């Protein structure tokens, strides 16, 4: 795999994906869609990868969504058309390894395909979030539907309906739970890597089972989610694990946030 629209590397059980079209605001085109299909397959199947860091080159934007100049290939038959999110979104590609998104600059429109299915989002102080669809006369549906699963409905509607007329600041994104940490730009990537190293050091099966149980619960009733979660603990936790001597587990120097 030798992608041209992103940089991809694996080290110390961490896959680092860098959107690498800064001249086009890291917008996605057909090539990027195809490359993400391969990337998510690699991440899903490579047991050496425990966690993913998704970041973007350049200072102006994490991503502004679809490349409106190049677009992407569409089937002529409307019933055969697919959404770009089917290629870009990690959970739709059955990736249950944690994804940490590090956002700087603008994150707009189709950028939410990544953000909506990230497990942890951190951003720089200059980050802004918005969805321009309605300003261009387009229905805003898929991105805000995904966003409504992680922030309050009223905030989702405000983002979707105000389009280009309002942007969510990093501070406001923190207040509404869109991001969990705001940092100076020069610290962003280092902090993402630090979080990734902490997660990657934990037992991979436990981490992936946890991610899958939580995300799948969002599409289920509470009782069904609890039954599925119980089965995952039985599958993912070896017999006798509950009786493990916890005194033998190393105690880290934990942090308070």
Protein language model regions, located:
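Conserved CoA-thioester-binding segment of acyl-CoA-metabolizing enzymes
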Residues: 1-59
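C-terminal alpha-helix plus adjacent terminal tail
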Residues: 1-12, 59, 70, 164-172, ...
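Hydrophobic/aromatic residues within transmembrane alpha-helices
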Residues: 17, 54, 67, 114-116, ...
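Histidine-centered beta-alpha loop that forms part of the nucleotide-sugar donor binding/catalytic region
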Residues: 20, 66, 104
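Ligand-binding pocket scaffold of soluble enzyme catalytic domains
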Residues: 28, 75, 126
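Glycine- (often His-adjacent) and acidic-residue-rich active-site loop
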Residues: 56-94, 107, 135, 221, ...
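Crotonase-fold acyl-CoA enzyme core
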Residues: 93-204
């Amino acid at each position: 795999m030798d992608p041209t629209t992103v940089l991809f590397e694996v080290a110390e059980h961490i896959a680092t994906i860098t959107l690498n079209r800064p001249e086009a605001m890291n917008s996605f085109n057909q090539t990027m869609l195809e490359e993400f299909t391969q990337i998510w397959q690699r991440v899903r199947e490579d047991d050496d990868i425990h966690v993913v860091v998704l970041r973007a080159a350049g200072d102006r934007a994490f991503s502004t969504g679809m490349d409106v100049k190049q677009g992407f290939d569409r089937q002529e038959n409307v019933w055969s058309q697919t959404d770009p999110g089917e290629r870009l979104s990690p959970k739709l590609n059955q990736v249950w390894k944690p994804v940490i998104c590090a956002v700087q600059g603008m994150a707009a429109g189709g950028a939410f395909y990544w953000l909506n299915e990230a497990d942890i989002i951190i951003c720089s102080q200059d980050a802004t979030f918005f969805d321009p669809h309605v300003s261009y006369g387009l229905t805003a549906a898929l991105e805000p539907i995904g966003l409504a699963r992680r922030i309050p409905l009223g905030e989702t509607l405000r983002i979707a309906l105000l389009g280009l007329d309002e942007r969510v600041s990093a501070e406001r994104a923190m207040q509404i739970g869109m991001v969990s940490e705001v940092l100076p730009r020069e610290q962003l990537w280092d902090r993402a890597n630090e979080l990734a190293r902490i997660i990657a050091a934990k037992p991979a099966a436990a981490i992936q089972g946890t991610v899958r149980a939580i995300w799948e619960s969002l599409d289920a009733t509470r009782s069904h989610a609890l039954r599925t979660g119980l089965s995952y603990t039985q599958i993912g936790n070896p017999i006798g694990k509950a009786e493990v001597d916890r005194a033998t587990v190393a105690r880290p120097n934990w942090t308070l946030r």
